[in-house]
Amino acid sequence: MIQPQTRLNVADNSGARELMCIRIIGASNRRYAHIGDIIVAVIKEALPSTSLERSEVVRAVIVRTCKELKCDDGIIIRYDDNAAVVIDQEGNPKGTRVFGAIAHELRELSFTKIVSLAPEVL
C-alpha cells in the first residue's frame, strides 16, 4: 500500500532512481494506492546526465508493493520492495527497459507497453 510520502524504487532505465509519492491520481479521498494505480511523484534521486533530474515532478505507475496481493486463483504474491515505472501523460513508459518482475494485473489495466518490456510477469 502506497500513500503520500512513501518512497519507491524506480523499475526502469529512465534515469530516476528513487521517487516519493505526492498524490494518487483518480482518487480524491483514497488513502492508499495499489499495483496498477497511477501516482504523482517527485524524483528524490537521479542518475547524472539523464533527461530526468532531481526534484522533478513525474507520473508513475506502481508495479510492485510489499503489501500482499491476492489473485483470483487464490495465490498471494508479495514483493521485496515498492517499485514504480515512470510514464508520460499518455501512459507510455519513459524508459526503454523494465527491471524485475511485475504483476500480471498491469496487463488487465491496459499497460501492455510496460508488460512487454518486463523480463518476468507474475
UniProtKB/Swiss-Prot annotation:
Gene3D superfamilies under this entry?
Ribosomal protein L14 (2.40.150.20)
| Pfam families in the cross-refs | Ribosomal_L14
Q: Which GO terms describe its molecular function?
A: large ribosomal subunit rRNA binding; structural constituent of ribosome
Stored SUPFAM superfamilies: Ribosomal protein L14
Q: Keyword Cell wall biogenesis/degradation on this protein?
A: no
Where is this protein found?
Answer: Plastid, Chloroplast
Q: Does the keyword Amino-acid biosynthesis apply?
A: no
The family database entries (InterPro entries) matched by this protein are listed as: Ribosomal_uL14, Ribosomal_uL14_bac-type, Ribosomal_uL14_CS, Ribosomal_uL14_sf
| CDD domains, per the entry | Ribosomal_uL14
Keywords from the UniProt entry: Chloroplast, Plastid, Ribonucleoprotein, Ribosomal protein, RNA-binding, rRNA-binding
Subunit info?
A: Part of the 50S ribosomal subunit.
* Listed PANTHER family: 50S/60S RIBOSOMAL PROTEIN L14/L23, LARGE RIBOSOMAL SUBUNIT PROTEIN UL14M
Which family, according to UniProt? Belongs to the universal ribosomal protein uL14 family.
Q: What does this protein do?
A: Binds to 23S rRNA.
Question: What is the protein name for this chain?
Answer: Large ribosomal subunit protein uL14c
